[in-house]
Amino acid sequence: MNPNQKIITIGSASLGLVFLNVILHVVSITVTVLVLSNNVTGPNCNGTIIREYNGTVRIERITQWYNTNIIEYIERPSNEYYMSNTEPLCEAQGFAPFSKDNGIRIGSKGHVFVIREPFVSCSPLECRTFFLTQGSLLNDKHSNGTVKDRSPYRTLMSVEVGQSPNVYQARFEAVAWSATACHDGKKWMTVGVTGPDAQAVAVVHYGGVPVDVINSWAGNILRTQESSCTCIKGDCYWVMTDGPANRQAQYKIFKAKDGRIIGQTDVNFNGGHIEECSCYPNEGKVECVCRDNWTGTNRPVLVISPDLSYTVGYLCAGIPTDTPRGEDSQFTGSCTKPLGNQGYGIKGFGFRQGNDVWAGRTISRTSRSGFEIIKIRNGWTQNSKDQIRKQVIVDNLNWSGYSGSFTLPVELTKKGCLVPCFWVEMIRGKPEEITIWTSSSSIVMCGVDHKVASWSWHDGAILPFDIDKM
């Protein structure tokens, strides 16, 4: 062959191969369509698939038409039932770590809020950490002066338990410098107190929407629990204080359903002082262990019935659990009156276990450092000094702070009793350390059927931050 014939032959062969390739593709597509259209055992391409995601608030409905997806979003209905919360507390032999947020350590380089007063509360699906922000971030100029309790910048926000109070995962709840929150089984209810000291207002949110308000009745810093409120069979209960922090004030119990106040009662407690109650459900009642900021180093106890009748007194145990306090050996205990003659105080908690009590307290008698929980035999009903168990949570070389109670509902645990849990705030910065800010992180513990070793789950942040050196 001459060169021209070779070129023509090669070109013809190439065109033939291309034509054959096209025919093979057409045959392949035709066979595929015929097989899929006649495959009665295959998936229904014309059907509807429902996928429900617990982590969202919607149902995803996907209608499939061959390779075309039409996606519709329909609102997920709210939970059908209220939580009962009438079960007894589980007996706890010790307390195991549930979560630790390490917010201040992370906040040295991360976008973490300056906070105080963190607390935990649970729904049938999850537990959340609530906290009062200062409208500023750690290691930022706006953190200056955040030792102040009340300002127009403070808000109640929340994250899933264990997460740091960071900008990216936090959910806004209410404008507040004092707050409480709880879940009735259907929706979250929050109570946020804000406004001027003499005319503060508490706004009740239900499902994220403002539903009701409580105006200051005594004109002296209306305030509430700084820990979880308590819902029983759809009714939610919490305690509020209005009046002086260092002498007789006024106290009220509130009851709400779906965020609307349906009842309230005054607590008659002449000579006693109630603030910042830590409450939990137990056998159909609400049991609260509170703070006496006037004179007592023993803690007030308030037990609330569904009809808003109540009993009020003091934790009977012969061991004091407030701070500051005197020596254990010099304390006698009383079920009815304040003892100790020590002003000031700190938010704390206790759990009734039959006639016994688990009670938390700082290890230091004079400052907010260290934390331990002790079990006192017959301490709920008698002036007992019989300390039968102790577990250290934060050693006395490290700062602690407020502490409070909550329970794990049976819907979460599948138990026949409510698991007692508590959190400990670990305050860092002013007034004890050389910084321009005050903030905190927290450790959360829950009751278990076994003894748990003492350790120190302290905050661990290295101070000062860069902003403190400027």
UniProtKB/Swiss-Prot annotation:
Positions of transmembrane segments = 15-35
> Which Gene3D superfamilies would you find in this protein's record?
2.120.10.10
Which Pfam family, any one, appears in the UniProt record?
Answer: Neur
The prosthetic group or cofactor this protein requires is:
Ca(2+)
Q: Which domain of life is it from?
A: Viruses
Protein topology in the membrane: Single-pass type II membrane protein
The ranges of region (Involved in apical transport and lipid raft association) come to 11-32
Q: Where is this region: Hypervariable stalk region?
A: 32-86
**Entry's EC annotation:** 3.2.1.18
Picking any one GO molecular function of the record gives: exo-alpha-sialidase activity
Q: Which residues bind substrate?
A: R116, R150, E275, E276, R291, R368
Top class in the EC scheme: hydrolase
Gene Ontology terms, cellular component aspect?
A: host cell plasma membrane; membrane; virion membrane
Q: Where in the cell is it found?
A: Virion membrane; Host apical cell membrane
The reactions it catalyses are:
Hydrolysis of alpha-(2->3)-, alpha-(2->6)-, alpha-(2->8)- glycosidic linkages of terminal sialic acid residues in oligosaccharides, glycoproteins, glycolipids, colominic acid and synthetic substrates
Which of the residues are on side Virion surface? Answer: 36-470
Which positions does UniProt annotate for Ca(2+) binding? Answer: D292, G296, D322
- Please give the positions of the paired cysteines in each disulfide bond: C90-C417, C122-C127, C182-C229, C231-C236, C277-C290, C279-C288, C316-C335, C421-C446
- UniProt entry tagged with the keyword Calcium: yes
Q: What is known of its domains?
A: Intact N-terminus is essential for virion morphogenesis. Possesses two apical sorting signals, one in the ectodomain, which is likely to be a glycan, and the other in the transmembrane domain. The transmembrane domain also plays a role in lipid raft association.
This chain's function reads: Catalyzes the removal of terminal sialic acid residues from viral and cellular glycoconjugates. Cleaves off the terminal sialic acids on the glycosylated HA during virus budding to facilitate virus release. Additionally helps virus spread through the circulation by further removing sialic acids from the cell surface. These cleavages prevent self-aggregation and ensure the efficient spread of the progeny virus from cell to cell. Otherwise, infection would be limited to one round of replication.
Specify the protein name.
Neuraminidase
What is this organism's lineage? Answer: Viruses, Riboviria, Orthornavirae, Negarnaviricota, Polyploviricotina
Q: Which gene encodes it?
A: NA
